[in-house]
Design a protein with these regions (language model features):
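Active-site scaffold of zinc-dependent metalloenzymes
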Residues: 328-367
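Propeptide-to-catalytic entry region of secreted or membrane-anchored zinc metalloproteases
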Residues: 2-324, 336-339
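The catalytic-center signature of Zn2+-dependent metalloproteases
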Residues: 357-437
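Extracellular/periplasmic catalytic domains that process cell-envelope and extracellular macromolecules
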Residues: 212, 319-329, 352-357, 395-398
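Solvent-exposed loop/turn segments at secondary-structure junctions
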Residues: 226-227, 265, 337-342, 367-368, ...
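Intrinsically disordered, low-complexity boundary segments flanking structured domains
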Residues: 244-248, 310-322, 346-352, 383-395
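Structural recognition of the beta-strand scaffold that forms the well-ordered cores
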Residues: 220-221, 257-260, 331-334, 362-364, ...
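Short, solvent-exposed loop/turn elements at domain surfaces
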Residues: 226-236, 341-344, 410-421
Length: 437
């Protein structure tokens, strides 16, 4: 058979997307958002085109929003930042026979698994065809570990200018990877001389996921019981144990395995219901309703709770008193009541949760939603909000399905919209976690 000629003009292009009902589960997946994939839990904002939402918020002409917790201000796209992002997603310009070009990008998938384990995931392949090739083949440079089914795409009909072909594929990993594995989509055609020719028209990178790339994070979940002040005759306890599955699936996107220790059962929790000192952390909100405030005098709520928690541990076993000191353990205190703070102007801010600058503590409110805890845990692992200008990349606030956005501010129907992490966030948070033992 004649030798294949490479890099001839393409007449189709192929892109990888998550499975249709993906909600951040099964794997981490990142791609250049172009507004072509409907994310069911984030209607109208999920997959907003990065070209339109990469930029910065300005509080006045030339002055970038300085507060990493706020997205207020005029938003302006940043072409330089977007070009940097295009490089990150490995932009490739495919040339059609008539000289026109189409831009294509590499997608990335992260699969959390252990050595000698086998895992199969489902993805979608999105293809646009101007002229039908002889075949569209999926080839992997690590076929000893990576299996692809089907390895040939079946729908090759011309659809340029119309609806893309969407086909589900299964990728089976027979073991972990110590280096990236590339799945390339190869368009096989016949050139003008009747010779077979091929061109790469799409690419997916499976990121390395062996032991040296997997990390862990030790997290202590602590349920706190407060005095009765919300109309109940008994004090409320925070639910510290009910949301672990979502925490696990989100951190697994970054190849981080959370390792929980819990003080959150009916018998083990931090009881502050009769604690005299805790009364100074009970204030009235803007509606004259009592709530827990994040600061009293010179002591943050988390520091006060930790001091009391250490007393509780010492009473249980003196050897436990200092077990959780330092940053090796992330301590998370869960309250059942509302949590508030005061802004610089004295106005009340309602909090679903917060993390401390020393990356040691997280505090959760009774108003927390599905993604609040892991949002705060990821802050503790070094990730800023997506709309923070000091992040590696900055996105328009409330326009993504990212866990580090404030998308839930759009309304209750978006409470489950924050499901994903970007590849650069995988790398940053993973680098701040602890090696797997």
């Amino acid at each position: 058979m004649p030798e294949l000629r490479k890099y001839v003009p393409a007449e189709c292009f192929v892109e990888f997307r998550p499975k249709a009902d993906w909600k951040g589960n099964y794997y981490g997946f990142d791609w250049m958002r172009e507004g072509d994939f409907d994310i069911s839990v984030a209607p109208g904002i999920g997959d907003s085109s990065f070209k339109e939402i990469i930029g910065k918020h300005y509080v006045s002409p030339g002055v970038v929003q300085p507060d990493g917790n706020k997205y207020k201000g005029d938003f302006k796209p940043d072409t330089g930042l977007f070009k940097s992002l295009e490089t990150f997603y490995e932009r490739t310009d495919l040339v059609f026979n008539d000289g026109t070009t189409v831009t294509n990008y590499t997608a990335f998938v992260n699969v959390y698994m252990k050595e000698k384990e086998t895992k199969t995931i489902e993805l979608q392949v999105r293809s646009i065809v101007r002229k039908s090739p002889e075949s569209l083949e999926l080839r992997c440079d690590r076929s000893d570990i990576v299996g692809i089914s089907p390895s040939n795409l079946s729908d090759l009909g011309v659809n340029y200018g119309g609806k893309p072909h969407m086909q589900t594929i299964k990728i089976t990993l027979k073991d972990t990877l110590d280096n990236p594995a590339d799945i390339k989509v190869v368009s096989v055609t016949v050139d003008k001389d009747g010779l077979p020719a091929e061109n790469i028209v799409g690419k997916l990178t499976i990121c390395p996921n062996n032991k040296s790339n997997r990390k862990k994070k030790a997290i202590v979940l602590i349920s706190v019981k407060t005095p009765s002040f919300s109309g109940l005759w008994f004090g409320k306890r925070g639910d510290a144990a009910g949301n672990k599955d979502f925490i696990v699936q989100t951190l697994h996107q970054a190849l981080i395995d959370p390792q929980f220790e819990e003080y959150a059962s009916f018998f083990t929790y931090l009881d502050l219901s009769d604690d005299p000192g805790f009364k100074s952390y009970i204030k009235e909100d803007a509606h004259q309703r009592k709530a827990v405030v994040n600061w009293s005098g010179s002591t943050g709520l988390e520091k006060y709770c930790y001091a009391k928690f250490k007393e509780y541990l010492k009473d249980m076993d003196p050897a436990l008193e200092n077990k959780y000191n330092g940053n090796d353990y992330l301590k998370a205190f869960y309250f059942g009541e509302n949590l508030i703070a005061y802004d610089r102007d004295g106005s009340v801010i309602y909090l679903n949760g917060y993390s401390t600058a020393d990356h040691e503590f997280v505090v959760m409110s009774g108003t927390a939603i599905q993604s609040t805890a892991v949002h705060e845990f990821l802050h503790a692992l070094g990730l800023p909000h997506t709309f923070h200008a000091k992040g590696d990349y900055c996105y328009r606030g409330l326009y993504t399905e990212n866990v580090l956005d404030y998308t839930h501010h759009l309304g209750d129907e978006f409470n489950n919209a924050r499901i994903s992490l970007y590849k650069w966030q995988w790398t940053k948070s993973n680098g701040n976690a602890q090696p797997e033992p």
